[in-house]
UniProtKB/Swiss-Prot annotation:
GO terms for molecular function: RNA binding. Residues 3-70 form the Sm domain. It comes from Encephalitozoon cuniculi (strain GB-M1). This is Probable U6 snRNA-associated Sm-like protein. It comes from the Eukaryota.
Length: 70
């Protein structure tokens, strides 16, 4: 099984999709993370609105994965 920190390092500076426990979906470029899996996304968007920088608290994150272009 892949260590979560190794997984996140693979996606640094890449477009990712993040789902939260409350059901929200965010997309953006993963700029950084810490030991609590708090994430910093840039050029992020959620449900049609865009922000330059977004911070997501690790305890609220359900999953992180590559942004799939469909």
């Amino acid at each position: 099984m892949l260590d979560p920190f190794c997984f996140l390092k693979m996606y640094l500076k890449e477009r990712v999709e993040v789902k939260t426990k409350s059901g929200e979906a965010y997309t953006g470029t993963l700029e950084g993370f810490d030991e609590h899996i708090n994430l910093m996304l840039t050029c992020s968007s959620v449900e049609g609105s865009e922000d330059k920088v977004l911070f997501l608290r690790g305890e609220n994150i359900l999953f992180v994965g590559p942004r799939l272009l469909l």
